[in-house]
Amino acid sequence: MAENPNVDDLRAPLLAALGAADLALTTVNELVGNMRERAEETRIDTRSRVEESRARVAKLQEVLPEHLSELREKFTADELRKAAEGYLEAATNRYNELVERGEAALERLRSRPVFEDASARAEGYVDQAVELTQEALGTVASQTRAVGGRAAKLVGIELPKKAAAPARKAPAKKAPAKKAPAKKVTQK
């Protein structure tokens, strides 16, 4: 059988193209695997942080009455009120910082198209963490107010009635990041 020189001339470029396609496929598969690992790590990390927050809130609920009884013994009603206001302000400031940080982190995640699924799950976890934090903040505020009221009664001071809480403004939901259109390939 006579060999066709034209087939031999095309063999090397065709094999090179096949090798390049195989390399590209392998690289894409590795990238997808890495992205899946990172998404899973992020999900696990977020879940563990939520669980840690729940544990801290539970511990705070256990320890708070002890701390409040110690404070009741140490402080007068005015000192107790000032301390409670300081704690409430510090907790509110920290909470607001965490909200801002969470929003920034969510925007960074949303800006990466490969993490859209992971960011959607993370957003759910963030919402859960925010709800837990709000519950904890509400519990701390109500218990602090109750202790202040009891301390005032013990001392014989009448506290002003609790003003109606102003309506909280719900944080604006941000639209999901839009995908950039695919680049057009021009032939030369």
Curated annotation (Swiss-Prot):
Annotated spans, Disordered: 162-188
Cystine pairings recorded for this chain: none
Compositional bias ranges of the Basic residues kind: 170-188
Protein task: Might mediate adherence to host cells by binding sulfated glycoconjugates.
Family statement drawn from the similarity comment of this UniProt entry: To M.tuberculosis HbhA.
Protein name, UniProt field: Heparin-binding hemagglutinin homolog
Organism, scientific name: Mycobacterium leprae (strain TN)
Name of the gene this protein is made from: hbhA
